[in-house]
Amino acid sequence: MSNELLLEIGTEEIPAAFLPKALQDMSSMIRKALTEARIPFGQVHTFGTPRRLCLAVADVAEKQEDQVIEKLGPARRVSFDADGNPTKAALGFAKSQGVDISEIGTMQTDKGEYICISRHISGKSTVSLLSEMLSRLITSLSFKKSMRWGNLDFRFARPIHWILALYGGEVIPFRIENIESGATSRGHRFMHPEAFPVSNLQEYLARTREHFVIVAPEERKRIILEEARKAAAAVSGRVLENEDLLETVTYLVEYPTIVCGSFDRKYLELPKEVLITSMMSHQKYFPVVDQEGRLLPFFITINNTLARDPAVVTRGNEKVIRARLSDAQFFFEEDQKIRLDDRVEGLQQVVFHTLLGTSYEKVQRFRKLAGWIADRIDPSLKNRVNRSALLAKADLDTQMVGEFSELQGIMGREYALLAGEDPTVARAIYEHYLPLTAGGDLPQTHEGAIVSIADKMDSIAGFFGVNLVPTGTADPYALRRQALGVINIILDKKYPLTLDDLVDECISILEEKLKRPAEETRKDVIEFFRGRLENMLISQGHPHDVVSAVLAAGFADLVQVIKKIEAMESFKAHPAYEPLAIAFKRAGNILKEFRNGRIDPALFSAAEENQLYSTLLEARARVVKALEKDDYPAALLELAALRQPIDHFFESVMVMVDEENIRFNRLSLLEALFSIFRRIADFSRIVTES
């Protein structure tokens, strides 16, 4: 038989950001615990609100599965004599296991027949195991921030006030400090705070609802969306929906109710990002827009109670947003009294990082690098690139960005436009922060793209240069995201930049800030980019072996890397693909310690040598011509023509002969052959079926 398991941890309000992971952890922890305990179970569900973490497991077996443990002893041939009597080896084994010799059996293994014992262990009752299991689960939960509360000897996000623990309707007894498990839950803190008993999940869901608690996050999310849409429609608008904000407010409330408020139309004259940031980031309000996406003077907020007088709640929220927007309007007006040009000097008071100097110093560095990049892409861009880089961080000195840090770049763009800057420069000021997330929007202007690359490269090389590199678990300066940003911008714009040159120039500009040798820093930065590029390409679905093969042949030119990978993937269908890969592996093993040598055709003694050499000379000329045009598919087809001569060579010619000059000549031929393959990829890394 099986029963239902129900656990609820009642707490003070846990931060919304902590809850999704905590519920996910509870699910994985109970699955692991039951599996390791050999207790069969069915579906696992989790529920959560700011004041409770809940876990329900269906069809939990009443006892562990029985277990048979087999213990091998000595080989049978040394365990019994010719008459079948047990030897000292067998008797000693039986004694060590606490069994009679008559209980000894035999088992056939790969190494022969051995004596053994088999113990049948009956499973314990589930009830006898759950107390410790659930207690351990609760005390093992981890949060981004936690502390010890009162006399508790373990850390938790917030103080625990009650524990509901039931199996088959009966309490699972355990105690965590002064909190004893029971069969009662509690209602909404303000609307129905009384404790109430429950006996199963169905009753739990019904009674929590009666007490103004909707424990299922997905249901709260649905209610919020539906009611917010209705409220926005009532003022002829629609909700500006945002999944992150929706997730946050879902975990901020136990019983969501909707309030629609308004603000003075004069605030609509502020940049829309200012209004949206004020509402969404700071107040957790949903903005309301018209059908064209223009902001309306309304907002939707999610309340956690049924208000006796909704108008009072509405006025309270309107008062809060009015103060926020009034401050924003003041900042907006005051900031415009000082031009962005004049704010650049103020960046000397803004620390970028104690080891890398001020934001002013950073601007001077990446401004120089941006000019270097512009010279290589299109010198006609240089003046606008220089201006964009100069003003890129100027808004860090404004009151608006000081209050709303999320608006950096956005306010720089707005203030630049208001001051009459070239619109391309204004846009580049904003775009140099892009992409904001992995897979996010990329800069559209060349000016924005170039300054973005320069800024990110300065950060990456700078932090590597002072030995603040990402670890497996931490990347506090978002260097992985910035490296992906550089890669994606270069690929998107198809810029003819090589990583080697870019890193070299960046490190030379940073030289006085470096705390490590420049060459060591350079090597680590390039390897860091290789890792980011490899992960990105594999995550995009490119075969692991093809990615590895192409990157091993060089990855400095990112645009060419993509072309090579695409050509290699198409070439996979060619009959010569796998045979060439196999031959390359074979040659690679032979050539491990060999360095380039000169080929002397006069030393060829086999027809297969001459055939391979002549075919190589013809193919190499055509391959080089194709590579000059970046025509990798054509180059690979030319290489495919070498398949038969290569096969014949390996079938008929012994490379590692005793005669040194002949051996050296044949190695030189192989090296010349496969060096041209390596212009595209290291075929030895290709996974073959043979």
UniProtKB/Swiss-Prot annotation:
GO cellular component, one term: cytosol
Catalysis performed (reactions): tRNA(Gly) + glycine + ATP = glycyl-tRNA(Gly) + AMP + diphosphate
Example of a GO biological process term: glycyl-tRNA aminoacylation
Keyword Acetylation: no
GO terms for MF: arginine-tRNA ligase activity; ATP binding; glycine-tRNA ligase activity
Location(s), subcellular: Cytoplasm
EC code(s) of this entry: 6.1.1.14
Record PROSITE patterns: AA_TRNA_LIGASE_II_GLYAB
UniProt keyword Methyltransferase present: no
NCBIfam families assigned: glyS
UniProt name for this protein: Glycine--tRNA ligase beta subunit
Source organism per UniProt: Syntrophus aciditrophicus (strain SB)
Originating gene: glyS
